[in-house]
Amino acid sequence: MRLESVAKFHSPKSPMMSDSPRATASDSLSGTDVMAAMGMAQSQAGFGMAAFCGKHELSQNDKQKAINYLMQFAHKVSGKYCGVAKLEGNTKAKVLQVLATFAYADYCRSAATPGARCRNCHGTGRAVDIAKTEQWGRVVEKECGRCKGVGYSRMPASAAYRAVTMLIPNLTQPTWSRTVKPLYDALVVQCHKEESIADNILNAVTR
């Protein structure tokens, strides 16, 4: 069972569910099976499960839990980023909270997010390769160059920058780009890493 099935479980079309064809109905996962598997996955990958469930609007509590997990991670690695490491305690905590909140919002974006769908590929992540289409005489697709194949635009990092400057008024754009934005980007990446870990654990416990 993969994480995507967890989202489907919360709006089921039937009381039984399965990721793949099964020999018999008894091999499918019941609601009790799914809840037990989710509990096991949460105990081993709490960050990833909270991030995913919050992303899919399954729980407002999970959204806040995911941001809290992300803040803990940010505190842990903040010493590597001089623009954050040198900040005073209270200011640093507030900046990390802002970065974690915006990074999680970026992670949550998808082609279904209002206004985020790529205008070039309309959310498919694929675009027509005009040169090869003309060369081969048939439609040839390639990764959409505008969205890099994801089907949607990322949240502009400038939004996080503006929020951080409310706490650090003298933070210039170049300094942000060199010393703070790398941490913001790392937080977004960490969300995806934690989701992948949770997905693998959930798959393992439901085999």
Curated annotation (Swiss-Prot):
Disulfide bridge partners, by residue number: none
GO annotation, biological process: DNA-templated transcription termination; transcription antitermination
GO MF term set: DNA binding; zinc ion binding
Any Pfam family: Antiterm
Residues the record marks as site: Interaction with host rpoB: T101, A160, T165
DNA-binding region: 171-192
Start and end residues of each stretch annotated as Disordered: 1-28
Coiled coil, from the record: none
Residues the record lists as binding Zn(2+): C118, C121, C144, C147
Residue intervals of every unnamed zinc finger in the record: 118-147
Keyword Transcription regulation in annotation: yes
Superkingdom of this protein's organism: Viruses
Site (Interaction with host RNA polymerase sigma factor RPOD): residue numbering on this chain: E134
InterPro entries linked to this entry: Antitermination_sf (IPR038500), Antitermntn (IPR003222)
Alphabetically ordered keywords of this record: DNA-binding, Host-virus interaction, Metal-binding, Transcription, Transcription regulation, Transcription termination, Zinc, Zinc-finger
Function of the molecule: Mediates the switch from middle to viral late gene expression by associating with host RNA polymerase (RNAP) so that the latter can read without pausing and through transcription terminators preceding late genes. Competes with host factor sigma 70 for binding to RPOB, the beta-subunit of host RNAP. To join the elongation complex, binds a specific DNA Q-binding element (QBE) and interacts with RNAP that is paused during early elongation. Participates in the lysis-lysogeny decision by activating the expression of the late lytic genes.
Subunit and interaction comment: Interacts with host RPOB (via flap domain); this interaction renders host RNAP resistant to transcription pausing and allows it to read through termination signals. Interacts with host RNA polymerase sigma factor RPOD (via domain-4). Interacts with host NusA (via N-terminus and AR2 domain); this interaction releases the autoinhibition of NusA.
Family: Belongs to the phage antitermination Q type 2 family.
Listed name of the protein: Antitermination protein Q
Organism encoding this protein: Bacteriophage PS34
Lineage summary: Viruses, Duplodnaviria, Heunggongvirae, Uroviricota, Caudoviricetes
